[in-house]
Amino acid sequence: MKKSARRQSRELATQGLYQWLLSNASSGEIDAQLRGALGYDKADKELLEAILHGVIREHATLVEALTPSLDRPIEQLSPVERAVLLIATFELTHHVETPYRVIINEAVELAKTFGGSDGYKYVNGVLDKLAAKLRPAETQARRNG
């Protein structure tokens, strides 16, 4: 199945944030490396840039929003889970035009692609809690049918 440009952007953002979490390289360095990555030409570059630079710029705020939904300190999560959760938190707060279920489903797929065997289940549970806090009207409307 062919990946959408938005999915490709999220995959590249996950790879870039993983690298940033491990190396603390600048967003410019990571951006330059991603430009040479497989699939870059098929990505939605505007979305990729918004996510990558937005998550790095707002890291502390995103961690603060995410932490109450975690069952352990964020430092104990794998770098892949952290990157995926940070991307989803950024999208939940900044891309309100994207339905929360789409954001969660994309995050689960990223965790399946890049993470450990059951990491996607954890990501799903955390984001369900977080979406209820960040988008209460939208999540309640969905639950009420």
From Swiss-Prot:
UniProt keyword annotation of Plastid present: no
Statement: the UniProt record of this protein carries the keyword Membrane: no
Sections of the chain in a coiled coil: none
Keywords: RNA-binding, Transcription, Transcription antitermination, Transcription regulation
A GO MF label: RNA binding
Cellular component aspect of the GO annotation: cytosol
A GO biological process held by the record: transcription antitermination
Summary of the function given for this chain in its UniProt record: Involved in transcription antitermination. Required for transcription of ribosomal RNA (rRNA) genes. Binds specifically to the boxA antiterminator sequence of the ribosomal RNA (rrn) operons.
Family: Belongs to the NusB family.
Protein's recorded name: Transcription antitermination protein NusB
